[in-house]
């Protein structure tokens, strides 16, 4: 049984979402960020239940010019397999049934709350595509910044240092999305994109008032399983250390 936490919507929250006529207006997401990256990047289904195993070419074969009656040595390319993991981004929404039913605006009220969750999931996903680091947060997938973080690394030639030394530096990315270059992934056998489950009316335990008491609430579940696969580092360039205060 779920527990309705102190993060649940209150009557005051509900009142703030009504216009003078008692209807639920469209809410402008003032904190919204434009994450066109999520629509621009290409996505493929992974070949693993937890992500995607990709083969990366790490070395080219040796070739040579030859003279008549002289041969050349055979050679081969060198490859390596890399397992890219996916993360599970989730959220739960629980609204007191009677609170949602006030003034008969149940559907509109739940929709306004759903839009907030969609925006939050969208922003978090866009943030993780660039700054995810499973070394610091094991629940995340590795984003692009952790892969382009050292000028002395093999892909350091694709990192341009803008020279900023402040604490508010940012980066500009140039990415050629593609199935053979850089792309998004989702686990094998799963659905792509943001998944929403309307679990309807359920009984939840509330932490407000007397502990252990129960109430009826509308419950929604949100989930997004995704990751990033970097197959060819030559197709992404990072212009790093841009001082935004100057």
Q: Where do the protein language model's features map onto the residues?
A:
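N-terminal low-complexity, intrinsically disordered segments
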Residues: 48-80
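Short, low-complexity, charged/polar segments at coil/turn and helix-coil boundaries
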Residues: 38-47
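Core alpha/beta structural scaffold of self-assembling particle/tube/pore-forming proteins
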Residues: 2-39, 52, 77-246
């Amino acid at each position: 049984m779920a527990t309705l936490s102190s993060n649940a919507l209150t009557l005051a929250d509900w009142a703030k979402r009504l216009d003078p006529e008692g209807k639920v207006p469209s809410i402008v997401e003032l904190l919204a960020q434009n994450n066109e990256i999520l629509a621009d990047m290409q996505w493929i289904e992974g070949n693993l239940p937890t992500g995607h195993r990709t083969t990366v070419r790490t070395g080219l074969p040796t070739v040579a010019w030859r003279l008549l009656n002289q041969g050349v040595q055979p050679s081969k390319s060198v490859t390596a397999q890399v397992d890219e993991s996916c993360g599970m981004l989730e959220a739960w929404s629980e609204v007191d049934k009677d609170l949602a039913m006030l003034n008969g605006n149940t559907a509109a009220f739940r929709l306004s709350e759903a839009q907030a969750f969609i925006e939050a999931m969208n922003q978090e996903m866009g943030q993780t595509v660039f700054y995810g680091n499973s070394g610091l947060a094991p629940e995340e997938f590795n984003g692009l910044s952790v892969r382009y973080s050292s000028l002395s690394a093999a892909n350091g030639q694709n990192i341009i240092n803008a020279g900023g030394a402040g604490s508010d530096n940012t980066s500009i990315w140039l990415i050629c999305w593609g199935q053979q270059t850089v792309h998004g992934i989702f686990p094998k056998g799963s659905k792509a994109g943001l998944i929403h489950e309307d679990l309807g009316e359920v009984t939840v335990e509330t932490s407000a008032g007397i502990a252990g008491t129960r109430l009826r609430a509308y419950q929604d579940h949100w989930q997004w399983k995704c990751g990033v696969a970097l197959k060819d580092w030559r197709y992404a360039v990072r212009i790093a250390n841009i001082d935004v205060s100057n």
